[in-house]
Curated annotation (Swiss-Prot):
GO cellular component terms, A-Z: cell cortex
Function summary: Copper metallothionein that protects the cell against copper toxicity by tightly chelating copper ions. Required for antioxidant-mediated growth rescue in the presence of fluconazole. Acts as a critical factors for lung colonization and virulence.
Protein name according to UniProt: Copper metallothionein 1
Family: Belongs to the metallothionein superfamily.
Length: 122
């Protein structure tokens, strides 16, 4: 099933399993890659559902405030983001006890333990 969205935001576009591969957000709160305007900052200056990736307008994989960007590794998608200088890098651990995948080693050492799925982070 093709994910043909209208120009405006369409949260029901990816409601079917056939279209899930075109989704950039969780089911029920998703945006379609076929509708870039719905996940990127609009030309008029209005804010859209974008990640905190240095203002690049990368599409979110999760709801605003708890999103990872498309350019992040797939294993890190659909998780909260760490406070790594506002880079929007995906967390490998729960909020408050997390290390970012692209953070310096010293920043990862600040956490005592976490369930990092094979990333080797602290």
């Amino acid at each position: 099933m093709a994910c043909n969205c209208p120009p405006q935001k369409n949260t029901a576009c990816c409601s079917t399993s056939e279209a899930q591969d075109k989704c950039t957000c969780q089911k029920g709160n998703c945006e379609c890659k076929a509708c870039p305007n719905s996940t990127k900052t609009s030309e008029s200056g209005g804010k859209a559902s974008t990640c905190n990736c240095g203002g690049s307008g990368e599409a979110c994989t999760c709801p605003p405030g708890q999103c990872a960007c498309d350019k992040c590794p797939k294993k890190a998608k659909s998780v909260s983001t760490c406070g790594c200088g506002g880079s929007g890098a995906a967390c490998s651990c729960p909020p408050g006890k997390c290390a970012c995948d692209n953070c310096p080693k010293q920043a990862q050492e600040k956490v005592s333990s976490c369930a990092c799925s094979g990333s080797g982070a602290a």
